[in-house]
Amino acid sequence: MTLNLRVLSPNRVIWDSEVKEIILSTNSGQIGVLPNHASLVAAVDIGVMKIRLNGQWSTMAMMGGFAKIDSDRITILVNNAERDVDIDPREAQENFRIAKADLARAEGKRQAIEADLALKRARTRLEAINASPPVSN
C-alpha cells in the first residue's frame, strides 16, 4: 500500500507522487505516517521531512506550514520547502555560517528571534542533505 503525498508552496508543486511512508516534523514533535493513518491536521515545524520510496529515503527541508492527513492522502501546505537533491551543499554550509554569525551579533530581542529562525532554517537545509538513511524493504 502507498500514500499519495502532495507538498505545495504558494508558487509551485514541490512533490506529488506515491510514497511508502513519511516522517514529518510538527510543532508537537515528529510523527510517522503509514497507509490508513488516522485523519489529522497538524502544524508543520521548520525541520526535515523524511520520505520513504521503494527501498530508499529522500528528504525535504520544510520551512513551516500545515499538513492534512486523511487515510492514504497527505496534503502539506508549506511556506517553502526544498528537496535534498535541490540543495547546493556549499551554499547551505555558507548560509549556516552566516546565520550563526548573525545570531552572535544580534542586538535586542527582535533581532535575536529573527536570527534564531534564520539559523534554524539554515540548519534544516544542512540536515536535509545529510539525512537520507538507506533502508531495505
Swiss-Prot record:
Q: Could you confirm whether the keyword Cytoplasm appears in this record?
A: no
Q: How does it assemble?
A: F-type ATPases have 2 components, CF(1) - the catalytic core - and CF(0) - the membrane proton channel. CF(1) has five subunits: alpha(3), beta(3), gamma(1), delta(1), epsilon(1). CF(0) has three main subunits: a, b and c.
Which InterPro entries has this protein been placed in? ATP_synth_F1_dsu/esu, ATP_synth_F1_dsu/esu_N, ATP_synth_F1_esu_C, ATPsynth_dsu/esu_N
Give the location in the cell: Plastid, Chloroplast thylakoid membrane
Q: Which family does it belong to?
A: Belongs to the ATPase epsilon chain family.
Its protein name is ATP synthase epsilon chain, chloroplastic
Note the topology in the membrane. Answer: Peripheral membrane protein
Tell me what organism the protein belongs to.
Pinus thunbergii (Japanese black pine)
Q: Which domain of life is it from?
A: Eukaryota
Kindly list the GO molecular function terms attached to this UniProt entry: ATP binding; proton-transporting ATP synthase activity, rotational mechanism
